[in-house]
Design a protein with these regions (language model features):
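Active-site proximal loops enriched in glycine and acidic residues that flank catalytic Cys/His/Asp
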Residues: 5, 35, 177, 214, ...
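Short beta-alpha connecting loops at secondary-structure transitions
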Residues: 51-60, 243-247, 360, 381-387, ...
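Flexible phosphate-sensing "switch/lid" loops adjacent to ATP/NTP-binding sites
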Residues: 1-333, 340-357, 364-365, 372-378, ...
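Cysteine-nucleophile active-site neighborhood
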Residues: 14, 18-22, 351-447, 452-455, ...
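Acidic/polar loop patches that form or flank catalytic/metal-binding clefts of enzymes
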Residues: 209, 235, 271-275, 387-388, ...
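C-terminal and late-domain segments of enzyme folds
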Residues: 443-447, 451-568
Length: 568
């Protein structure tokens, strides 16, 4: 299944592809998505979040596009580096092979060598992208950009060749297009969509399915016109108009019969497991019913970030909070704030007026750091529910060192290499990587040993969890005892090394003050909300609605008064 955009980028190719993949997965088929990017970067790790949104870290440590997060959340399936390819990876692989002499003296060209490498990668994914490394029934290919872009032309050519080689019943192309609806005209116009699809057909690709993005449901008249000019029957044209939530898209596709059309096109009926489909639909149905149900409460959570002007920079945090609200029967409004504008305690108190809890997320560089520290101090001293993530974890340590231990110059060597009290310093294996930036951090899934009877254990219901990391700095080991004796409890650690990974204050000191060196937002799923976020939202609900403590759904996530005290 190949999904290619036309007219414009940003239409939701990942949402379409992952939603359709979910329907086939629900039927018992093994699906393997892949995103193919046209940029020359090896991965997304060094991209500016203002330009490209958040970096989504996979289990194996690859730093990828935020669309991989969409695939993982909708499919509820962990992906790996084989599910993400850039032009930089393709060219790098070819040049390495050329230097090794793998091409036997031939002149290396775009065709057949570059396109051949793309096809090889896709065939390998087809053979190993299923459960436990087995074959996949369907590979979903999302081509970044739009038809006609110079950067993705070799991908489209490779996919055209692959379709020819594998046969018409092995490949299905989807053109995702856009239907204009100018306010001055008051009607939908299909000309841009027609031209965009024509541009794709000029590349030698005949789409079998067309998905029409639009503000409102696409009229049958418009779909008939598009079908006539693109040789696609009406029953294979899908109106992908705006909906209240992206999680409604799979059900909309099912109602339109799109899954049945794909099974017919690719002759996959004999691989359907009806029993698994019923079970999967019941699970998603429960989630969908909660999604549309009226919420009993409403709270506001402040996101104290450095890239607050672009919500895509924190896309997974946005989704993790949404998941928690659904399962806690609460509407959660996010208030995005740029900490680089906060210069005093008064500034922080003013912007946090009416906020029921805060998240201090990750980031790099010194801009906005002092504002983050002020936010942590405000949360700690006013008992405002607090969740720190990555850099937010480190800022919680520095704030505690400055204001509880009394070391006013406590800092991180990232921001002040000459500080006399380096409470945060580089991980030992990072110090030898001077001048190398891309792909060198502590990346991917790592084990976290959770302290018994701690707040973290109460949330996770486990003494060993696996979370995803993306950092270069850690709590300086020789300060750990001083911090612990003063009341900052490290309840999550690396099982073998003195790397602190979760911190918290006792329930007697704070209802919810917890921070993680890892990125918990990356593992939140629609039907399995992330525990640390659940603890934060539950505490925010109790702060605003004390009577909600009698709600068992909320109370089970609260910081038990005996938990961290007993552990200490």
């Amino acid at each position: 299944m190949v999904v290619i955009g036309t007219v414009m980028s940003g239409l939701g190719k990942g949402i379409f592809s992952s939603s359709l993949a979910k329907l086939l997965k629900d039927k018992g088929l093994a699906v393997a998505p892949i995103k193919m990017e046209g940029y020359l970067n090896i991965d997304s790790g060094t991209l500016n979040p203002f330009r490209h949104g958040e970096v989504f870290v996979l289990e194996d440590g690859l730093e990828t596009d935020m669309d991989l997060g969409t695939y993982e959340r909708i499919l509820e399936q962990n992906l790996s580096r084989r599910n993400f390819v850039t032009a930089g990876q393709i060219y790098g692989d070819i040049l390495d092979r050329e230097r090794r002499g793998d091409f036997l003296g031939r002149d290396v060209q775009m065709i057949p060598h570059v396109t051949g490498t793309v096809k090889m990668h896709l065939r390998q994914l087809a053979m190993t992208g299923g459960p436990d490394g087995g074959p996949a029934d369907v590979v979903f290919v999302e081509v970044g950009g739009t038809a006609g872009d110079y950067e993705n032309g070799f991908y489209i050519e490779a996919l055209r060749e692959l379709a020819f080689e594998e046969g018409p019943e092995s490949t299905c192309f989807v053109a995702l297009t856009y239907i204009l609806e100018p306010a001055t005209l008051g009607e939908q116009k299909s000309k841009a969509a027609q031209l965009g699809i024509k541009r794709l057909m000029e590349c030698g690709v005949q789409p079998q399915v067309i998905a029409c993005r639009a503000t409102n449901p696409v009229t049958e008249k418009v779909m008939q016109k598009i079908g006539m000019f693109s040789n696609v029957p009406l029953n294979r044209i899908f109106s992908m108009h705006d909906r209240e939530s992206i999680y409604f898209i799979p059900d909309a596709m099912r109602e339109a019969g799109l899954d049945r059309e794909i099974l017919s096109l690719l002759q996959l009926h004999n691989r359907v497991n009806a029993g698994k489909e019923d079970q999967s639909r019941r699970k998603w149905s429960e989630f969908s019913s909660r999604l549309v149900a009226p919420r009993a409460h409403r709270v506001t959570i402040g996101v104290m970030g450095k890239y607050a002007s672009l919500r895509d920079a924190y896309a997974s945090i946005d989704k993790a909070v949404e998941h928690c609200g659904i399962w806690l029967n609460a509407s959660v409004d996010l208030k995005w704030m740029d900490t680089s504008t906060l210069e005093s305690k008064a500034d922080v108190a003013a912007v946090l007026q009416g906020v029921d809890g805060i998240i201090v997320p990750g980031g790099f560089g010194q801009r906005g750091v002092e504002g983050k520290i002020l936010c942590v101090e405000h949360a700690r001293t006013t008992r405002l529910p607090f969740l720190g993530i990555c850099l937010g974890f480190q800022m919680a340590v520095i704030e505690f060192a400055r204001n509880v231990l009394g070391l006013a110059d406590a800092n991180s060597t990232e921001f002040d290499p000459k500080t006399a009290h380096a409470f945060i310093s580089e991980l030992p294996d990072q110090k030898k990587l001077e001048g190398i930036v891309g792909g060198t951090m502590r990346l991917g899934a790592q084990d976290v040993a959770i302290e018994p009877r701690s707040f973290a254990e109460h949330l996770y219901k486990s003494n060993l969890v696996r979370e995803r990391f993306r950092h270069r700095y850690e709590v300086e080991p020789h300060y750990i005892d001083a911090l612990t004796k003063a009341g900052l409890h490290f309840s999550g650690r690396h099982p073998k090394h003195p790397i602190m990974q979760v911190l918290e204050l006792s329930a007697s000191e704070h209802p919810c003050f917890v921070a993680a060196q890892f990125h918990p937002e990356l593992t939140s799923r629609p039907t399995m909300p992330q525990p640390l976020f659940m603890g934060l939202i539950a505490a925010a609900l109790i702060r605003k609605y004390p009577q909600a403590a009698s709600d068992e759904l909320i109370a089970r996530w609260l910081n038990a008064p005996t938990a961290t005290a007993a552990a200490r």
